[in-house]
Amino acid sequence: RSDRRRFYWACPDCHGRFEAAPGLKLFSMLPDDKTLLEEVRAADISAMAKHFGRVVCPHCGSMPEHRHKTHMNKGGIWVPDGVRFTETGEMVGTPMKSSIRGYWLGGVAAAYQSWESIVEQHLLGLRDYALTGSEEKLKQTTNTDQGMPYMPRHLVEAKGSGQTPRDRVEKDLRRFIVPPDTRCVLVSVDVQGGQ
């Protein structure tokens, strides 16, 4: 319902505009979680966070230092959904029409959150998941530090496998038949608007 504005920085090197996106997308040196799950079990998390906690400009590949974040935030602009930047820095597109302004700021642009700490918290969450199977730390850091909604690991893995719910159906179950001791059958459907 809102116009869904997102915060854009200008690269200190090439001056190209890019979204200070929620999540870990700008930490493009960071390996994928599948690779990290093995590494974080015994690795020095602080050293890994220091190494991978660098934002990478998607235009020129430069890695501005964290000390530039305040300057980048001061020069940042809010861009509504439907608008993008050309290579010359011109805003083009049609902004979404709404009487409600909405803003989504990723943790990467948060004033009191260092890039290194965002990566470190993610790595600690992955370590906890790898050692205990608990997703609580991952969920917390994703929601609060990264500014992203958390998706449970089994859904991420199912999405990555390319399987649909229909592909995972158990073939030996008969349709419209319930076990003999069943006392009640409840059915619910969650319908998202427009989907």
What is each stretch, according to the model?
Residues 3, 46-49, 130, 134, ...:
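Generic alpha-helical structural element
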Residues 79-188:
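A contiguous, basic/glycine-rich beta-loop/short-helix subdomain that forms a polymer-engagement track
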Residues 187-195:
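Acidic, metal-ligating active-site segments
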